[in-house]
Amino acid sequence: MKILFTIVVSALLLSTNICLGKDLIIAGADWCPACVKLKNFVKTNPKELENFDVQIIDIDKNPEIKKNLQIRLLPTSVIFNNDNKIQAKLEGYTQQNFINWLNKNK
């Protein structure tokens, strides 16, 4: 598992990262309690995410990501398939729902 914490991202960078295999993108914010919990889970549970390359994006520093991924709720996690299309999207966070979602979309 590779985790990237992106400070600045554009639509082009996002597309490039996805093409390079960054297949799980988590959009959140530091002021969002559920986002902080998810970020901590990602950092402390690499085994759960071993099938994914993870990119965590702060939507306050990268507001265009909100439009690009049609984010309505934080955090939002998005898995891309091999064709760089959205395979699955999860809005919100509870640990068990996130783990179940990851396992379903390996």
Label each region the model flagged.
Residues 6-15:
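Bacterial N-terminal signal peptides
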Residues 15-22, 63, 67:
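A short beta-strand-turn-helix
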Residues 20-50:
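Local sequence-structure signature of Cys/Sec-based thiol-disulfide redox active-site neighborhoods
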Residues 26-27, 51-63:
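Thiol-based oxidoreductase modules, predominantly thioredoxin-like and allied folds used
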Residues 29-33, 60-64, 72, 85, ...:
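Solvent-exposed loop/turn segments at secondary-structure junctions
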Residues 39-42, 63-66, 95, 99-102:
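Extracytoplasmic/secreted envelope proteins and their assembly/folding machinery
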Residues 69-78:
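Structural micro-motif
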Residues 81-106:
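Non-catalytic, surface beta->alpha helical segment in thiol-disulfide oxidoreductase systems
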